[in-house]
């Protein structure tokens, strides 16, 4: 049986989870369609999801269409949970992007479609809520072509839009006399061979040839079929199901190839054990199999660790069922991988590590328990949540051991995190105000040398070496290079030094993560048997690295976002004034009828505040879209983040005193 891993994506409240329910009902998986408002949906299983009526974590359900097994992945719609969407994108074969026929194309819709197109993921568009008052299918189709993709092709139309009688009508040669021309011209734009056949007057293309070319170009992500319907009533669902079965590319991967799988979700079982969700790309996986997990950290380093599968479930007909083996194309739940994390790749590692599709969180906050004696429970709970969502980048609070620092996309995510800790772990917490996460970049090259030898009245046996810090490629990487013979130190010492380089550069001269930095080890020495790898890990590496970094100097960079803004002509002046007040850099406005479009950049820290002001500034008619676009040097006094508790490697004497417990 062929398999299709299908993602359902949408702006919040477009009806994504309702569509998932309707698909599961249509294919016989569930007897009754659940309601988001009533908290009875299949994929929103968390209590918080049911209470708030939003999807917070990706969920999997399975149905069968003839000889096609579809693993349906329902993803969050709110932008604060974009990291869940990112993890789902990495395992998809195709997607359905849901758009409301009333609200139309929203900012989050545009971000999602840009990413789907950039990744080449075959995508169908489903315009939902055609039966709701205010539905405007023709206008939304124009928005899709103007704002999402010019290669949108409508395969259905709507009669009696905006009423309970709304109907979806399939478009084709029998119902639309212009269908062949409209579809043929679009397909000819993307394929020269089809263009030649289309223009050949001696050969009239058949309906089958049009259908085959449409399927081929949809599978390549070149065109995007659009369907209309209502998840509430089920109208138009048959057309969408036909598109899923006939237009999206299914997988029939080799089971004889080496195992390759990706962990895209981690849950906890009833006894607190880790449960990994894996999408198998090739090969097979079964109970009692030994597995090698490959993990890529934020600097690009790859580490390996082993695990053994103690139990395995494969998704079949709605929910996971016990199986002995999962095969290529399956999504499986695996028990026994104690050290598993989201993003790990299992089995054979080939090709570069997966890159991030969306920007990392640009905000961070400090969490503290309301009752100090619950600090241990708080940290244990946060470690479990960090396994499930590594983007929160959990670390110890530098100023208070009872607290912890996490990274966030927005205030809604912070609210959900607080509710999760209270309701799932019994720990009530308070948050500090959020702050923007900056980075540091070296501005020059620095060298340092430290010789530590008790015979010269220094503090411990160590190694003389030099570290240079400069700007390498690729961007945002930390690279560690050897300019010495590998045998100049025991291998454990080299590993200790490299590990320490990466951990030390999490806090630069101003306390921020250092990026775009190359570190070169140019001299080494060891006096056996007194020197130990821990000497290099605790002191030598940190001291000499921070000394070299100080000589090179660093510059703090703040995150910056690009923005697009649509403003009624009458409200352009106050909007420009507010942008100037906030320190944004707008471009030249362009007029389109009675609306002005404006592009520019602004510090990411201002995006949330400005987005909240747009309705008031534009009398409810403005549209604002912002995306992370990188970093730029911070203006004015560089912001400083407190360093971790403990000895400060920027103060050599203090650091040695604390690390070695002697003078």
Swiss-Prot record:
Pfam families, per the entry: EFG_C (PF00679), EFG_IV (PF03764), GTP_EFTU (PF00009)
Keyword Transferase in annotation: no
GO molecular function: GTP binding; GTPase activity
Membrane-spanning parts: none
Annotated binding of GTP, by residue: 10-17, 74-78, 128-131
Gene3D superfamilies from the UniProt entry: 3.30.230.10, Elongation Factor G (Translational Gtpase), domain 3, P-loop containing nucleotide triphosphate hydrolases, Translation factors
InterPro entries linked to this entry: EFG_III/V, EFG_V-like, G_TR_CS, P-loop_NTPase, Ribosomal_Su5_D2-typ_SF, Ribsml_uS5_D2-typ_fold_subgr, Small_GTP-bd, T_Tr_GTP-bd_dom
Domain of life: Bacteria
GO biological process, one term: translation
Keywords per UniProt: Antibiotic resistance, GTP-binding, Nucleotide-binding, Protein biosynthesis
Domain tr-type G: 1-252
Keyword GTP-binding: yes
Signal peptide, first to last residue: none
Family: Belongs to the TRAFAC class translation factor GTPase superfamily. Classic translation factor GTPase family. TetM/TetO subfamily.
Function of the molecule: Abolishes the inhibitory effect of oxytetracycline on protein synthesis by a non-covalent modification of the ribosomes.
The protein's name in its UniProt record: Oxytetracycline resistance protein
């Amino acid at each position: 049986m062929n398999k299709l891993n299908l993602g359902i994506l949408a702006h919040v409240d477009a009806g994504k989870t309702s569509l998932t329910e309707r698909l599961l009902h249509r294919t016989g998986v569930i007897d009754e369609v659940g309601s988001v408002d009533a908290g009875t949906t299949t994929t929103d299983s968390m209590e918080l999801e049911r209470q708030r009526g939003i999807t917070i974590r990706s969920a999997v359900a399975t149905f069968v269409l003839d000889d096609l097994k579809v693993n349906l992945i329902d993803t969050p719609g709110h932008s604060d949970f974009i990291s869940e969407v990112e993890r789902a994108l990495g395992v998809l074969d195709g997607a359905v992007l849901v758009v409301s026929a009333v609200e139309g194309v929203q900012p989050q819709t545009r971000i999602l479609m840009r990413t789907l197109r950039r990744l080449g993921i075959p995508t169908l568009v489903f315009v939902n809520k055609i039966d709701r008052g205010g539905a405007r299918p023709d206008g939304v189709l124009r928005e899709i072509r103007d704002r999402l993709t010019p290669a949108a092709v409508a395969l259905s139309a709507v009669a009696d839009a905006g009423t309970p009688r709304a109907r979806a009508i399939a478009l084709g040669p029998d119902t639309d006399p212009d269908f062949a021309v409209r579809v043929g011209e679009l397909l000819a734009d993307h394929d020269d061979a089809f263009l030649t056949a289309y223009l050949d007057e001696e050969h009239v293309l058949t309906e089958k040839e049009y259908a085959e070319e449409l399927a081929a170009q949809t599978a390549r992500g070149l065109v995007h079929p659009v369907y209309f319907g209502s998840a509430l009533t089920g109208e138009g669902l048959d057309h969408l199901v036909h598109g899923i079965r006939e237009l999206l590319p299914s997988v029939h991967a080799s089971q004889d190839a080496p195992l390759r799988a990706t962990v895209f979700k981690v849950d906890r079982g009833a006894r607190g054990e880790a449960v990994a969700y894996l999408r198998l790309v090739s090969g097979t996986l079964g109970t009692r199999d030994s597995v090698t997990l490959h993990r890529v950290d934020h600097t690009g380093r790859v580490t390996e660790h082993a695990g053994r599968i103690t139990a395995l479930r494969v998704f079949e007909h709605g929910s996971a069922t016990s199986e002995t083996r999962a095969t290529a194309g399956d999504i499986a739940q695996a028990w026994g991988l104690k050290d598993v994390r989201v993003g790990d790749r299992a089995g054979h590692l080939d090709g570069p590590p997966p890159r991030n599709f969306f920007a990392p969180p640009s905000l961070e906050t400090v969490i503290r328990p309301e009752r100090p004696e619950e600090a241990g429970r708080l940290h244990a709970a946060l470690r479990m949540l960090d396994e499930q969502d590594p983007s929160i980048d959990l670390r110890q609070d530098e100023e208070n051991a009872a607290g912890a620092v996490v990274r966030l996309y927005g205030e809604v995510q912070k609210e959900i995190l607080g509710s999760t800790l209270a309701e799932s772990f019994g720990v009530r917490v308070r948050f500090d105000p959020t702050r923007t996460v900056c980075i540091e970049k070296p501005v020059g090259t620095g060298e340092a040398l430290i010789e530590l030898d008790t015979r010269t009245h220094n503090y411990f046996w160590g190694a003389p070496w030099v570290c240079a810090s400069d700007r390498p490629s690729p961007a945002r990487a930390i690279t560690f290079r050897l300019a010495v013979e590998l045998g100049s130190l025991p291998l454990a010492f080299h590993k200790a030094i490299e590990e320490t380089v990466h951990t030390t550069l999490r806090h630069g001269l101003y306390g921020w993560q250092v990026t775009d930095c190359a570190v070169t080890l140019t001299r080494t020495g060891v006096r056996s048997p007194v020197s130990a790898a821990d000497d290099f890990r605790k002191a030598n590496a940190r001291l000499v690295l921070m000394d070299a970094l100080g000589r090179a100097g660093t510059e703090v960079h703040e995150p910056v976002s690009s923005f697009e803004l649509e403003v009624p002509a009458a409200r352009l002046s106050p909007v420009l004034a507010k942008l100037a007040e906030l320190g944004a850099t707008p471009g030249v406005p362009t007029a389109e009828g009675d609306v002005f479009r404006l592009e520019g950049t602004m510090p990411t820290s201002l995006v949330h505040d400005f987005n909240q002001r747009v309705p008031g500034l534009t009398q409810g008619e403005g549209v604002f879209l912002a995306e992370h676009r990188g970093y730029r040097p911070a203006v004015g006094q560089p912001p400083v983040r407190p360093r971790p508790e403990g000895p400060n490697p920027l103060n050599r004497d203090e650091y040695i005193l604390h690390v070695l417990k002697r003078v």
